[in-house]
Structures are given as C-alpha cells and as structure tokens.
C-alpha cells in the first residue's frame, strides 16, 4: 500500500507541478499554422499506438513526440501536453486499455512501475523544453548585444545592416545617408576625462534618436562617428533632417560636473534613389559619398552640413 501511495503521489507531482508553475492565461489566443500542429498530432498518434500495441514498452511511445513538442512549443504548452499525456496513460493503464500485464493478472507492483515510468518519461520533455527556452533567451541576448551599441543604445554597425533588411522598408524609393562626427570630441576627453566623453556620446545619441524618431535609423559606427539612414519618397526629406539634427545639437547644452558644454556636429550627406532589394548596396555607395562630404564639412570649419546635391553645400 505504501508503494502504491508513493508512486501515485510522485507521478501526480511530476505531472502537475510543472504545469501549475508555468500556467499562464494568454490575453490573446495564438494562431497555430498547420505545420505547427504536427508535433501535437504525432503525440496523439503515439498514444493511440500505445493502446494498439500494448506492453510495458508502449508507455514510452509518446516520448519522441513530447520531445518534438518541447523543441517547437513554449515550456507552458509543453508542460500542459506532458501533463495531459501522462494523465491519459495512467488512466488507460489503470483501466487495462493499455495492457502492460503481459498475460499475468494486473497487480499493484506493476501499477507502481507504470506510474514511475510515466513520471520519468514526463521529466525528459520538460527538461528539454526549459533547456531550449534558456538557449533561445541566450541567443536573443547575444543578438541584442551584437545589434545595439552598449554605451549609446543605438544600432551598432552590424545592427544597422540588419535593420536595413526590415520588411517595413519595402516602400523605400529614396535613401539619405548622413555621417555625423562630434566636433573636437578628443578635446572633451583630454580636458574632462573619458567618463565625460562616454556621457557625451550617450546623451548625443539619445538626442539624435529623439530628433530622428521613427523616420530613420541611427547607428554608432565607431568612436564619435554616427550614421543616420533616412528612407523616404522625397529626396529633400533627408537633407532637411540633417539640418534639423545639426541645429538641434548646437542648441542643446550638456552639463558635466556643474559645467555647461555646447556641442556641435559636422555632417556629410549622401543622397540618391534606392530600392528595397538593393538597399544595403545603396547604403554602402551613399556612405562613401557621405564620408567625402563629412571631410568637406570638417575642412571648411566644422558645424555644417555638406552634400554633393542641391546647391553643393548647406550651412
């Protein structure tokens, strides 16, 4: 009797506790595509096979399907499917629908073995599910660190190229690429220290991001150099945005240890027609143009916007 009680409590706990701990009621029920239902269908088929074939080994038939579910579904769904499968098997064994007696009368020791076997089987997909969830979470963190600059929280160079592949840019007909360089940034590091320099970069990036908003993409290319890509249908939009950025930076005071600093920025602008299918290549070509114009802005006194179009130079 003690063995029967122990096996019942143990198997019940293994099946129910993970399900209860991960239980969450979604606000909106997710829509499953036909191919996403294949693991669940395989699970149903494997349980039916257990009934048809019988024998003690048939209790493990659903295990491959449960592991498939663990790989494809969330831990919450996996725990629920594991609980339902285990409960169904226990009920089927108890009512001799799945025959594991192999010709001998059904006894408590056999039920003890069946319950422990089902509980052990249930642990495997749950462990796999949480392992997969942990790996996916880690991969997202790695991707986030690769795509965003840690200091400024804007896109990194690689993140910008990934963002240019976004389906939201399919309507792009024109692209303006700006290359921004904070004027005399080295003197800020020399006079106020690198901690101040890092703070300047962070505040500068946040200010640029606020000005650009959802109209463009902001990235730190390295050091004090930033890039802004503005997809549009109007060639003038990008140039107006560049001047808005330059003036916005010039008028924005920066405070460091009770001292007020004013920053200026030199901007080079590359502008031209672009297509979503070749957006990365178009960006690279316009970056070369923007780099040339940035050099001109710095050579001609800094704190200015230079472009090869629309009057050669805007100040």
From Swiss-Prot:
Provide this UniProt record's keywords sorted from A to Z. Answer: Cell membrane, GTP-binding, Magnesium, Membrane, Metal-binding, Nucleotide-binding, Transferase, Transmembrane, Transmembrane helix
Which part of the chain is the GGDEF domain?
173-310
Which Gene Ontology cellular component terms are annotated? plasma membrane
Protein's cellular compartments: Cell membrane
In short, the EC number is 2.7.7.65
As a miscellaneous remark, the entry gives: The promoter and the first four transmembrane segments are deleted in E.coli K12.
Q: What does this protein do?
A: Catalyzes the synthesis of cyclic-di-GMP (c-di-GMP) via the condensation of 2 GTP molecules.
- Please give the subunit comment from the record: Homodimer.
Name by which UniProt lists this protein = Probable diguanylate cyclase DgcF
